[in-house]
């Protein structure tokens, strides 16, 4: 019964060590899990193309990129807390034949503002209609709740093509 004793000893102490206020360092696997869950992507559906330890503003982060459903995701997760420092998303591009602006500016603004709970028109800081490879798109920026959201919305389909989130210091 010598094998049973070490297993018993481990059940009491480590459980409390890990639950101190729920904040602590995260490893690479935990950082990937945090990013995937935030994006609503199952690990089985993601093809991780980059996962490495990096530094952002002097802070250790895991830089994690993956593709899922034709879209690209890019996350930075703080090593010391597991906090999402930044997250980005680039959707599939529509065909170049969709060069008519069929989505109104008001509808596109509503799409963007609906993604940021509590934000209103006064939180929109940049807004313009631009063309990317002949495709019309709205580009904008929302600053709300200490966070900056930069986005691109396809002006022909209304689809969110890019969505980048960064906490402001």
Regions found by a protein language model. Give the residues of each.
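Long, terminal "pre-/pro-" and other extracytoplasmic accessory regions
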Residues: 1-169
């Amino acid at each position: 019964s010598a094998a049973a004793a070490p297993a018993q000893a481990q059940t009491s102490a480590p459980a409390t060590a890990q639950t101190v206020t729920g904040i602590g360092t995260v490893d690479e696997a935990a950082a990937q899990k945090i990013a995937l869950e935030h994006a609503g992507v199952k690990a089985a559906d993601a093809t991780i193309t980059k996962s490495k330890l990096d530094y952002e503003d002097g802070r250790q982060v895991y830089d994690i990129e993956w593709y899922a459903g034709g879209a690209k995701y890019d996350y930075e997760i703080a090593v010391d807390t597991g906090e999402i420092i930044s997250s980005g998303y680039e959707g599939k591009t529509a065909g170049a034949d969709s060069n008519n602006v069929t989505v109104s500016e008001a509808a596109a603004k509503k799409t963007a503002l609906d993604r940021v709970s509590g934000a209103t028109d006064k939180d929109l800081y940049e807004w313009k209609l631009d063309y990317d490879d002949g495709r019309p798109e709205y580009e904008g920026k929302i600053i709300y709740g200490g966070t900056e959201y930069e986005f691109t919305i396809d002006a022909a389909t209304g689809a969110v093509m890019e969505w980048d989130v960064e906490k402001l210091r």
